[in-house]
């Protein structure tokens, strides 16, 4: 394991030059202090977890100190926001400190969010508040633990720096890790500003560093786009299967690597609601839970438009046509596993859709239903779950179909089925009310609840003694909370 001063930097994006980003120094926070750190994320950098408790750790990730090899840069990009094109966005409060490569040969961006004003801050102050920083930290690590592709979060550093939003709050910084922070909006920026040389340089950078296997294909850029389509289809399939609502699927929030990125007013479903809107600024429901699948395709088409200098329109359309079949295949595979099934049958999609409609009409807790379905035999489980449904006759009909399907599928013992289902059906998810409880405590200086919640969510499939309160249905006040983009 390494100390903080032993990290090895290789700042590949910074070497692209000033057309792609601007050198900016972070603005330090007052009286920085560690709120929470992820041992699993620190392991990606080969860091000894003990370094999180040292004073220099808080100083490095609050803007007070920098590694000599760091090259902090604010990236420039544009994007479609709620369907309308915004010509220039960029890192308005985040800085790419540099890229660190670990002993496994992996490169990880170190991105400090809340680091102060940049040339792209527009009307913002460049700061992030403790509330939003804790939410991003918890979500990043929770999604990773669920097996959903995501950026990672190393730590949150709190402070006494005042920041004004709807009210006065305290400033914080979160250190985000990802193999790359390049977004769909990077390509859109150079396409719409008609800078073909820089756009070609960016495309080569992404191809060589992040999709090198596509170099071997007859049309490398087309192969890369197909891979981006597949990764996004798989990511969104996992969002839908686990009930994750992103909230702000603008193209500047879409990673070129197909990982969940830029956490804002996100939420996991409590009661199943296909039309749930987690962002109270989304008045039209553009980014509602059920719209995430078509919006994923819309965003990929926006990226495709920006790639027309490298790929023919017909080839791009053909690649985009792969999205929905790929999504459906990934989604149905995961939903079969959540139902404890190991084989595929033609009627499985209809059976899943029928169940979700029943859950919608009865307000059934999405996460706990699947967990309890695997607690015992199919017959006993559905008998116990029956009372959760208003339409009992409808549920009984579904239950008969399900039991027959399980009987045809059965090639293992009940214990093996239970273990298989519990391995894909979490007991603990990041419910908004749990995050809010942790934030409320942290805002009064008590970080123990944030740390405990993080630890619980790092093992979502494993029953943890004494942590029953994290596996309950939310109280009425905690259901379907709408979160603002104010962060």
Stretches with model-predicted labels:
Residues 251-252, 256:
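Catalytic-loop Lys-Pro-X-Asn motif of eukaryotic-like protein kinases
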Residues 1-7, 17-22, 98-106, 120, ...:
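Phosphate-binding glycine-rich loops and adjacent basic patches that engage nucleotide phosphates
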Residues 25-26, 125-127, 222-223:
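Short, contiguous strand/loop micro-motifs
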Residues 6, 15, 20, 31-33, ...:
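Residue-level detector of functional hotspots within protein domains
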Residues 7-15, 112, 116, 126, ...:
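N-proximal short alpha-helices
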Residues 31-34, 40-57, 62-216, 257-259, ...:
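Conserved ATP-binding subdomain of kinase catalytic cores across diverse folds
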Residues 1-77, 278, 283-487:
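Regulatory N- and C-terminal appendages and interdomain linkers associated
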Residues 133, 162-246, 257-357:
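ATP-dependent phospho-/nucleotidyl transfer catalytic cores
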């Amino acid at each position: 394991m390494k100390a903080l001063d032993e990290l090895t930097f290789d700042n590949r994006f910074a070497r692209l030059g000033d057309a792609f980003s601007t050198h900016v120094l972070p603005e330090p926070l007052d009286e920085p202090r560690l709120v929470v750190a992820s041992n699993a994320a620190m392991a990606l950098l080969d860091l000894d977890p003990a370094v999180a408790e040292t004073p220099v750790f808080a100083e490095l990730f609050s803007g007070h100190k920098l590694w000599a090899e760091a090259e902090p840069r604010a990236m420039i990009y544009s994007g479609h926001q709620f369907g309308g094109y915004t010509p220039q966005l960029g890192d308005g409060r985040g800085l790419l400190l540099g890229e660190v490569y670990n002993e496994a040969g992996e490169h990880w961006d170190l991105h400090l969010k809340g680091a102060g004003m940049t040339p792209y801050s527009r009307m913002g102050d460049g700061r992030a508040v403790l509330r939003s920083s804790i939410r991003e930290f918890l979500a990043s690590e929770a999604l990773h633990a669920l097996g959903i592709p995501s950026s990672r979060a190393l730590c949150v550093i709190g402070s006494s720096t005042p920041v004004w939003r709807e009210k006065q709050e305290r400033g914080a910084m979160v250190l985000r890790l990802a193999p790359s922070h390049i977004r769909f909006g990077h390509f859109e920026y150079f396409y719409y500003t008609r800078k073909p040389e820089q756009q070609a340089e960016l495309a080569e950078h992404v191809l060589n560093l992040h999709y090198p296997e596509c170099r071997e294909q007859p049309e490398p850029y087309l192969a890369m786009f197909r891979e981006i389509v597949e990764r996004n289809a798989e990511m969104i399939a996992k969002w839908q299967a686990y009930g994750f609502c992103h909230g702000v699927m603008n193209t500047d929030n879409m990673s070129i690597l197909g990982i969940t990125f830029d956490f804002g007013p996100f939420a996991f479903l409590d009661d199943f609601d296909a039309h749930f809107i987690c962002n109270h600024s989304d008045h039209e429901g553009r980014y509602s839970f059920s719209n995430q699948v078509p919006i994923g395709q819309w965003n990929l088409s926006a990226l495709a438009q920006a790639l027309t200098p490298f790929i023919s329109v017909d080839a791009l359309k053909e690649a985009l046509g792969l999205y929905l079949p790929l999504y459906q295949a990934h989604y149905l595979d995961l939903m079969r596993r959540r139902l404890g099934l190991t084989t595929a049958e033609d009627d499985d999609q209809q059976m899943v859709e029928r169940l979700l409609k029943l859950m919608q009409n009865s307000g059934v807790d999405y996460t706990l239903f699947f967990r309890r379905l695997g607690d015992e035999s199919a017959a006993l489980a559905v008998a116990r779950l029956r009372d959760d449904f208003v339409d009992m006759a409808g549920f009984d009909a579904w239950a008969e179909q399900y039991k027959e399907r399980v009987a045809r599928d059965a090639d293992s013992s009940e214990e093996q089925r239970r273990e298989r289902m519990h391995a894909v059906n979490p007991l603990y998810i990041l419910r908004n009310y749990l995050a809010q409880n942790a934030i409320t405590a942290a805002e009064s200086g008590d970080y123990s609840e944030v740390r405990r919640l993080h630890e619980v969510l790092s093992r979502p499939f494993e029953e943890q003694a004494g942590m029953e309160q994290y596996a309950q249905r939310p109280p009425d006040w905690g259901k379907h909370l709408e979160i603002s983009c104010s962060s």
